[in-house]
């Protein structure tokens, strides 16, 4: 079981708004989708990281179990979300 956290990073002079996604296994930033609301942007970014982690597992020969989001909630400070991921047997 792992935790993924997401947080919003506003635009700078060189980069647009994005969601920062952090986990023990990997950290990434994903661009903000202006067609989605804030909650959906965080959820999509977390799922994108899960997809990256699963691709890494397949490359390493561990395709029998895949990461999947099993629970989600907002952070206590209100500055992002937390997602619990666990390895689930691949179908």
Indicate residue ranges for each PLM-predicted region.
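Catalytic phosphate/metal-binding cores of nucleic-acid and nucleotide-processing enzymes, i.e., regions
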Residues: 1-91
């Amino acid at each position: 079981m792992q935790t993924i956290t997401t947080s919003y990073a506003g635009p700078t002079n060189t980069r647009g708004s994005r969601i920062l996604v952090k986990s023990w296994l990997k950290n990434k930033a994903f661009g903000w989708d202006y067609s989605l609301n804030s909650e959906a942007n965080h959820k999509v970014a977390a799922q994108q990281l899960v997809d990256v982690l699963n691709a890494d597992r397949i490359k390493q020969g561990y395709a029998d179990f895949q990461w999947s989001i099993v629970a989600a909630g907002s952070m206590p400070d209100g500055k992002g979300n937390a997602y619990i991921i666990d390895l689930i047997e691949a179908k």
